[in-house]
Amino acid sequence: MAFLENGNHTAVSEFILLGLTDDPVLRIVLFTIILCIYLVTVSGNLSTILLIRVSSQLHHPMYFFLSHLASADIGLSSSVTPNMLVNFLVERSTISYLGCGIQLSSAALFGATECFLLAAMAYDRFMAICNPLLYSTKMSTKVCVQLIVGSYIAGFLNASSFLLSFFSLLFCGQNIINDFFCDFAPLAELSCSDVSVFVVVISFSAGTVTMLTVFVIAISYSYILITILKMRSTEGRQKAFSTCTSHLTAVTLFYGTVTFIYVMPKSSYSMDQNKIISVFYMVVVPMLNPLIYSLRNNEIKGALKRHFDRKTFS
């Protein structure tokens, strides 16, 4: 049943997701494409985690953070993609009330965790380039673990604000969501209760995560740029900058899509455009991160080559 009587309200027990399209042919095409992307996402990020674990050359803070970033990528993609794939194959795309809350909070958890991990990686690059003599002390195992744990705690707090706000909403029968997953904005539009407080809570939580991590990344790279420009050796400049290009690319992709979805005025783009950008943010970007780091990072390419050479000659 979609609705259950609850006092003077009709409580919603499930939501109908309109998805990306109702064209049956296009649904099959999108199912195939997104399934392939998801398989590459999971296999690519798992490979990154395993490679960092087995390669002693990659037992450095940067790759410790990268392995957790890969875990967050799998979590972010898995919070939405499996349900979306199932919905491509059924005529009526639904998600239970509880499932909607879990999906919403999972996306908030891994999205925020990824923000803080990217900020931690920027701080790591700042210490490596601007304070190389203090790097081993300032980025000790204890500090790295604290940054990782802090990232997950921040993600959990962000997810809690989303989940508590969701369970505080009242729904009076309307249960059709014009999206492919349970996002807070369309859910707030469906609610028959006063959502102003919860919108402020969500905006504050998501805004704090974004602003704080962007600030850390911007300050870190400002100092990095100043330090690189002061280097007299061209080779030194190139080497220092090459260690940052992969991370900068990942940051640009991630925050570019986040800015489009959550910062730009809703009137500046259509709902269909928002869906496309959301797919890019939650499905495509998690696939691109391992490719970016493996293709642009010489240490990872070297570790991959040594690993395959051992496999070939063993």
Swiss-Prot record:
Primary location recorded for the protein, binned into one broad class: membrane
Disulfide bridges in this chain: C100-C192
Residues exposed to the Extracellular side: 1-28, 79-102, 158-199, 262-274
UniProtKB keywords: Cell membrane, Disulfide bond, G-protein coupled receptor, Glycoprotein, Membrane, Olfaction, Receptor, Sensory transduction, Transducer, Transmembrane, Transmembrane helix
PROSITE patterns (UniProt xref): G_PROTEIN_RECEP_F1_1, G_PROTEIN_RECEP_F1_2
Cellular component annotations (GO), alphabetically ordered: membrane; plasma membrane
Subcellular location: Cell membrane
Membrane topology note: Multi-pass membrane protein
InterPro entries: GPCR_Rhodpsn (IPR000276), GPCR_Rhodpsn_7TM (IPR017452), Olfact_rcpt (IPR000725)
Function as written in the Swiss-Prot or TrEMBL entry: Potential odorant receptor.
Record's protein name: Olfactory receptor 5P66
Gene that encodes it: Or5p66
